[in-house]
Amino acid sequence: MEKSNETNGYLDSAQAGPAAGPGAPGTAAGRARRCAGFLRRQALVLLTVSGVLAGAGLGAALRGLSLSRTQVTYLAFPGEMLLRMLRMIILPLVVCSLVSGAASLDASCLGRLGGIAVAYFGLTTLSASALAVALAFIIKPGSGAQTLQSSDLGLEDSGPPPVPKETVDSFLDLARNLFPSNLVVAAFRTYATDYKVVTQNSSSGNVTHEKIPIGTEIEGMNILGLVLFALVLGVALKKLGSEGEDLIRFFNSLNEATMVLVSWIMWYVPVGIMFLVGSKIVEMKDIIVLVTSLGKYIFASILGHVIHGGIVLPLIYFVFTRKNPFRFLLGLLAPFATAFATCSSSATLPSMMKCIEENNGVDKRISRFILPIGATVNMDGAAIFQCVAAVFIAQLNNVELNAGQIFTILVTATASSVGAAGVPAGGVLTIAIILEAIGLPTHDLPLILAVDWIVDRTTTVVNVEGDALGAGILHHLNQKATKKGEQELAEVKVEAIPNCKSEEETSPLVTHQNPAGPVASAPELESKESVL
């Protein structure tokens, strides 16, 4: 407790008296020492933000040199190394953190927190989708852009649009990936449905083409299957009791060692971010044409991210916790800068875990349980730009969306964002699912791909912000439930009535008045019964 003459632990300058000297907090030396301490504590945040700004300046300076594609590849090499290191650490981090987190929580607490997390993810994603559809109808990003061609955007290597997939096959793939047939293969490959067109000639001379779905394996970690397996394994180890303690300690130790590796990698993040941002700016052919051609679509998407990330999510956090959400977000500047540069929720996961535990004091059991799940299934930012893109393409093709199609966009965007990969441009692949669901063509997807490198940055920031605020809400609710349980336990202890008879019989200070007699063995018998 502070004394009356103290403020934040320091003596007031008016009453400091002879204790004030060159090193006192009120002097220039004290202020310099506090400033140096602040810079030392926030060094990683300042370096990361500086890396983003330096990368933008580097890219702007090198654009006039007309670098070849080979030279741009060399320029991006330090950033590529950062992405490889972050992806290398994802597998042990996700599996170990979920196993240790699930094993450290009892079944009732795990079920309660899991239910709250699912409700939070569903609520925020659905609200993000509704906000995006409303903004798209207000701003009308597709009006006046009907004559726009992808070749006009100066992006030669945008590639072909993804093959459209049936909506039912997309959800079946989601279920298949939840239960991988081989855990080792799930670490680097994902199940995906492809199609084979079979031509059949009937006896009447009619030719029919049938599209048959076939199962394939594509490159990419099946994070959904690994998350589910790790959760179930943690619960099973908790169920084993003492027999599973050794394996739980193993996963805890491996998790702590992984976090040490993360802390080392984080010091390379500013360098990698600088070259990632710089190489991407150099790579673009004509940014001015790109922004002016699709400016309304970019504006609608980023405005949706700003409203959802700056108003909706903080408001939800405040309603549940009654705390300042922006003070909570201030401790997460480094993960936000990493998300902005890497465009990957999965690559931001190590940084987010480290900062949310050290800077914001979130319980490790909560953060290591909810953040890996959130990085996989909670995609608020992706839902926003997917809905805006769907309405944008509908307006490009002069299609008036009815109420049924709008409802389909909301539901499909909310559901498909669960299976969206937490990698750069992963959300673009799910736009084809939405377009197929409402009956729109997919030949305009290259326009979305052309500006995805811009929109995907704010998309990833909103994705990881939603995960972080969700962890903060769960931490607050868990603390509240713990305090309530301790208070109820204290009330039970106060109201308990001591057993005076038992205390009298078992106290070594009590001398019985009639120790001898025919009933001398009775106290011994009663004592034995009380032990049993």
Swiss-Prot record:
Catalytic function, reaction form: L-threonine(in) + Na(+)(in) = L-threonine(out) + Na(+)(out); L-serine(in) + Na(+)(in) = L-serine(out) + Na(+)(out); L-cysteine(in) + Na(+)(in) = L-cysteine(out) + Na(+)(out); L-alanine(in) + Na(+)(in) = L-alanine(out) + Na(+)(out)
Keywords tagged on the record: Acetylation, Disease variant, Epilepsy, Glycoprotein, Intellectual disability, Membrane, Phosphoprotein, Symport, Transmembrane, Transmembrane helix, Transport
SUPFAM superfamilies according to UniProt: Proton glutamate symport protein
Extracellular face of the membrane: 140-216
Residues modified by glycosylation: 201, 206
Record keyword Acetylation present: yes
Tissue-by-tissue expression: Expressed mostly in brain, muscle, and pancreas but detected in all tissues examined.
Residue numbers carrying N-acetylmethionine: 1
Keyword Transport: yes
Residue spans, topological domain Cytoplasmic: 1-41
Pfam families registered for this protein in UniProt: SDF
InterPro entries linked to this entry: DAACS (IPR050746), Na-dicarboxylate_symporter (IPR001991), Na-dicarboxylate_symporter_CS (IPR018107), Na:dicarbo_symporter_sf (IPR036458)
A GO-annotated cellular component: intermediate filament
Modification type Phosphoserine: residues: 507, 527, 530
Stretches for region Disordered: 1-25, 500-532
GO MF annotations in UniProt: amino acid transmembrane transporter activity; chloride channel activity; L-alanine transmembrane transporter activity; L-aspartate transmembrane transporter activity; L-cystine transmembrane transporter activity; L-glutamine transmembrane transporter activity; L-hydroxyproline transmembrane transporter activity; L-proline transmembrane transporter activity
A single GO BP: synaptic transmission, glutamatergic
Biased composition (Low complexity): 14-25
Role played: Sodium-dependent neutral amino-acid transporter that mediates transport of alanine, serine, cysteine, proline, hydroxyproline and threonine.
Illness: Spastic tetraplegia, thin corpus callosum, and progressive microcephaly: A neurodevelopmental disorder characterized by thin corpus callosum, severe progressive microcephaly, severe intellectual disability, seizures, spasticity, and global developmental delay. Most patients are unable to achieve independent walking or speech.
Family stated for the protein in its record: Belongs to the dicarboxylate/amino acid:cation symporter (DAACS) (TC 2.A.23) family. SLC1A4 subfamily.
Name listed for the protein in its UniProt record: Neutral amino acid transporter A
Native organism: Homo sapiens (Human)
Lineage, opening ranks: Eukaryota, Metazoa, Chordata, Craniata, Vertebrata
Protein's gene: SLC1A4
